[in-house]
């Protein structure tokens, strides 16, 4: 009997359940054995790395020359203010860049709602706290917003001519991705008498600049476009794909020694029970700076090395560590 491509099991349309305003669960079934892991892992990686978004990339603050400047009347240090600015969920409706401003006077909290925008820019989480003024003082900022995708550390985004850039212009690590978290699980599915089938369940959470369903559609379009280049083959060798044993990216299971950090940085991380890349990327910059003997120079090194691999800090991972992993290595 001749088997054609059209006879390969095709899933029904996805079932979408909106869990919160920015989070949704998508169920796709039935799938042939192994297809759920193949599709789930591919979609997860595209969702986290390739969905376009906007982020604040440069900041100028009156009276601030660098990120370690102390500002009188400001409760937070400048470094913490920059970290808070990175979490502002912002959307540019047209164009690739925008310049915004923030001015606040008097004691009190400064939020994203204090950023002055125009009709082309929209701030989603306007209640997000940026800093606190402790006395009757003022803070004046100029913010540059850009569109992009993925995570781009400041050390990677600086151009060679940036040494002559305006004094006081602070370049931020930019997390353009509007997708905050993606997890998938595979369950058994059944169609009539067939029980050797898969069900794919994807849990997606965004920052609100794009809804979860639209993010998934965009990821599927990207994958379709990438795979379309194979459509010109006159002969197709349909080899089998071995299903992944889990939904965890294999890169995250690699030890931090693979990052080739300096001995000092590596030892500081291991002293805090950070043994895998998956352990490391879940830490925030503030948490790492609290690590004994790990200073700003080591933090910069870690961010640069992760950035070269398309990774960043402050990532939320579901079900970590996965089964079979301990702080001493892979379990048999």
From Swiss-Prot:
Keywords from the UniProt entry: DNA-directed RNA polymerase, Nucleotidyltransferase, Transcription, Transferase
TM regions (residue ranges): none
Ranges for region Alpha N-terminal domain (alpha-NTD): 1-234
Enzyme class: transferase
Domain of life: Bacteria
Tagged with keyword Transferase: yes
GO CC list: cytoplasm; DNA-directed RNA polymerase complex
EC number, UniProt record: 2.7.7.6
Entry GO MF terms: DNA binding; DNA-directed RNA polymerase activity; protein dimerization activity
Recorded catalytic activity of this chain's protein: RNA(n) + a ribonucleoside 5'-triphosphate = RNA(n+1) + diphosphate
CDD domains: RNAP_alpha_NTD (cd06928)
The keyword Transcription belongs to this UniProt entry's keyword annotation: yes
InterPro entries hit by this protein: DNA-dir_RNA_pol_insert, DNA-dir_RNA_pol_RpoA/D/Rpb3, DNA-dir_RpoA, RBP11-like, RNAP_asu_C, RNApol_insert_sf
BP term (GO), one: DNA-templated transcription
Chain positions covered by the region annotation Alpha C-terminal domain (alpha-CTD): 248-332
Family under the similarity heading: Belongs to the RNA polymerase alpha chain family.
Domain notes for this protein: The N-terminal domain is essential for RNAP assembly and basal transcription, whereas the C-terminal domain is involved in interaction with transcriptional regulators and with upstream promoter elements.
Function: DNA-dependent RNA polymerase catalyzes the transcription of DNA into RNA using the four ribonucleoside triphosphates as substrates.
HAMAP family listed in its UniProt record: RNApol_bact_RpoA (MF_00059)
Subunit text: Homodimer. The RNAP catalytic core consists of 2 alpha, 1 beta, 1 beta' and 1 omega subunit. When a sigma factor is associated with the core the holoenzyme is formed, which can initiate transcription.
Name the record gives this protein: DNA-directed RNA polymerase subunit alpha
Organismal lineage: Bacteria, Pseudomonadati, Pseudomonadota, Gammaproteobacteria, Lysobacterales
Designated gene of the protein: rpoA
